[in-house]
Design a protein with these regions (language model features):
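Interhelical loop and adjacent transmembrane-helix boundary motif
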Residues: 15-17, 33-39, 69-72, 81-92, ...
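Membrane-interfacial helix termini and adjacent extracytoplasmic/periplasmic loops
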Residues: 25-32, 71-75, 81, 129-130, ...
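Transmembrane alpha-helix signature in integral membrane proteins
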Residues: 65, 91-122
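Short hydrophobic faces within alpha-helices
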Residues: 97, 122, 139, 194-202, ...
Length: 300
């Protein structure tokens, strides 16, 4: 490679080369019609994605007001409030929904406690098996549910455990902990642990420091993890189906009923769950807005 000499002209400055870029690229990039086509294409794709996501939800809500001709609520026949007036017409649906809510509450409480402790340990402390623990936490997020469900079923059979409520709890906690730990870990990654040290230096007990300093700061991450865990537990089918006993959760009951009938009460329950989920989402947005507003007032 030739070395530059004193007689070689100096390269032009970066600003001069940047000024020549429009001439090289064609005076401002692509032509206007191509940019307009790109914007239109992006808009069409975005609208199509939204329609694909929300039209099934709208159909579920609309068909909760349907009075079907037969046993299957597939074809619109007549507007009616019968399903809303008597949502518990089928006792098996009510029992399945109550069981799903009970399972989801227990799984959420256990997973949030264990997942939060694991996340705090992963961020706050250094230990030799930290990489192994991180890998184990990621495995349930990437493993197919049928593989995890069947492996847990094999384990329960080997231990001679009767499948039922607690086997479902254990199975769901096994994959829910990963979601909680990942969510809370992302929240507390930038946490200032010196605040805890300052509280301890001032004479506060460790529990008081956690209650007054640590917990309020990581609470948004814990709430987000709790809502995610509750939704995943309520929705889970494969792992629950493989490890459940005689009693059936709501998704399993719907799958069983589809062989004989699809009553509009299913749409009523689905719409109710949707409205509750939207209410919690709006509440989270409101709380986040209030917190941002307070921080803005403290740091003008």
């Amino acid at each position: 490679m030739a070395t530059p000499t004193a007689t070689d002209p100096a390269p032009p400055p970066i600003s001069a080369r940047s000024a020549d870029m429009p001439a090289i690229l064609g005076h401002g990039g692509p032509p206007p019609w191509l940019r307009r086509l790109g914007r239109i294409s992006l808009t069409v794709v975005a609208i199509g994605a939204l329609v694909y996501l929300f039209v099934p939800i709208v159909v579920v809500v609309i068909y909760s007001f349907n009075k079907p001709l037969g046993k299957y609520n597939y074809v619109w026949h007549q507007f009616s409030l019968d399903a809303w007036a008597d949502p518990f017409k089928f006792p098996e649906l009510k029992d399945a929904l109550l069981l799903s809510l009970k399972v989801a509450c227990v799984v959420t409480i256990i997973s949030v406690i264990l997942g939060t402790l694991i996340a705090m340990a992963m961020v706050k402390y250094r230990f030799k098996a930290k990489g192994v623990v991180g890998t184990v936490l990621v495995l349930p997020l990437t493993m197919p549910e049928v593989v995890m469900g069947f492996s847990l079923l094999t384990w329960f059979v080997a231990l001679n455990w009767s499948r039922g409520f607690w086997t479902v709890i254990i199975a769901q906690v096994m994959f829910s902990i990963s979601y909680v730990a990942t969510t809370v870990r992302a929240r507390i990654r930038g946490f200032e642990w010196r605040l805890e040290e300052a509280g301890l230096d001032l004479g506060a007990k460790p529990w008081r420091v956690f209650r007054l300093i640590t917990f309020p700061l990581i609470l948004p991450g814990i709430l987000a993890a709790a809502l995610l865990t509750f939704a995943l537990s309520l929705d889970d089918f494969i792992i629950t189906y493989l490890n459940s006993g005689i009693d059936q959760t709501f998704p399993i009951e719907i799958w069983t009923l589809k062989k004989s009938r699809i009553p509009p009460q299913i749409n009523v329950f689905a719409t109710t769950i949707l409205l509750v989920s939207v209410a919690f989402a709006l509440l989270g947005v409101y709380i986040g807005f209030r917190r941002s507003k307070k921080l803005g007032q403290l740091n003008p």
